[in-house]
């Protein structure tokens, strides 16, 4: 079955036609495009997700960029969130914290997780990792969601 799509409406149409979830349409398109197995495609995406998690876990608030303009703010946001005074609340506070940490790691030339772009390097990792942590979601479900975001 051919899984060519050019828009979200194409994705929805294919998912409905084949009675499969959206993420599987994207996975099958990847399988066709790269000529790999379903398992290889899923494992590649899992490795990308794990790289995002590793970048988050390896954040070091003491490292400052060469310009001195980036570094340490992720740690400040962490302390602010931990204080319980955050106006943004649990999930949104966590997303902002992780996004800043990813951006700082990028600026300090640590692991660069450019998703969706280098200019917004922390957005997808921050949202996904925070959701996984805050909502106690499984890694497999997060990898499936990553296919949809692709």
Residues covered by each model-derived region:
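Generic N-terminal targeting/processing segments that precede catalytic cores or assembly contacts
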Residues: 1-110
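Glycine- and small hydrophobic-enriched segments that form the cores of compact globular domains
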Residues: 87, 116-121, 133, 144
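Amphipathic, well-ordered alpha-helical segments in soluble domains
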Residues: 95-98, 123, 148
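Short coil/turn connectors at secondary-structure junctions
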Residues: 107-110, 121, 137-143
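Conserved phosphate/anionic-ligand binding catalytic regions in large, soluble enzymes, centered on
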Residues: 109-127
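Alpha-helical support elements that line or immediately flank enzyme active sites
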Residues: 125-136
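A structural-propensity feature for long, helix-poor, extended segments
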Residues: 143, 147-150
